[in-house]
């Protein structure tokens, strides 16, 4: 599979940075695929503040900045247009508005997949949600 575009959910980034078991190795592989150019990876703009906030209990400010720089070497940042955010507001069938925004950000870059460990939260997603492990299996086919 060539030219695959993915949006990586904040939970995958957090699994990677915090070496959270049992997800760390799968998260590492996703970040590595993005960094090496096997896939083109994106991170939703609003995920950066989520990552920053959660990491405050794991590490000091300087370390968080260093980790964000590393992540941003592997992933491009994307947002959603005004129109896509308005569309998200109207998508009341999404249980979690933040996940709906992830879906809109993925749509904005024509992503084929949202890489997440919370696939169940994306059952209404326009973009296919897949776990890091399942994505790696898919790529190997």
What are these model-predicted stretches?
Residues 5, 40, 77, 114, ...:
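A residue-level structural signature of the nucleotidyltransferase/glycosyltransferase Rossmann-like core
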Residues 11-12, 46, 120, 133:
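Alpha-helix/helix-capping structural signal
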Residues 28, 38, 48-76, 81-83:
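Active-site-proximal, substrate-binding regions of enzyme catalytic domains
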């Amino acid at each position: 599979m060539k030219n695959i575009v993915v949006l990586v959910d904040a939970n995958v980034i957090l699994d990677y940075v915090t070496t959270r078991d049992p997800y760390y190795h799968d998260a590492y592989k996703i970040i590595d695929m993005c960094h090496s150019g096997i896939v083109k990876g994106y991170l939703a703009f609003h995920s950066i503040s989520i990552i920053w906030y959660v990491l405050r209990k794991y590490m000091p400010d300087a370390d968080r900045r260093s980790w964000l720089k590393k992540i941003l070497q592997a992933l491009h940042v994307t947002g959603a247009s005004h129109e896509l955010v308005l569309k998200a507001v109207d998508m009341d069938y999404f249980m979690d508005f933040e996940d709906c925004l992830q879906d809109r950000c993925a749509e904005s870059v024509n992503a084929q997949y949202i890489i997440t460990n919370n696939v169940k939260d994306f059952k209404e997603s326009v973009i296919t949600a897949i776990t890091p492990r399942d994505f790696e299996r898919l790529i190997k086919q």
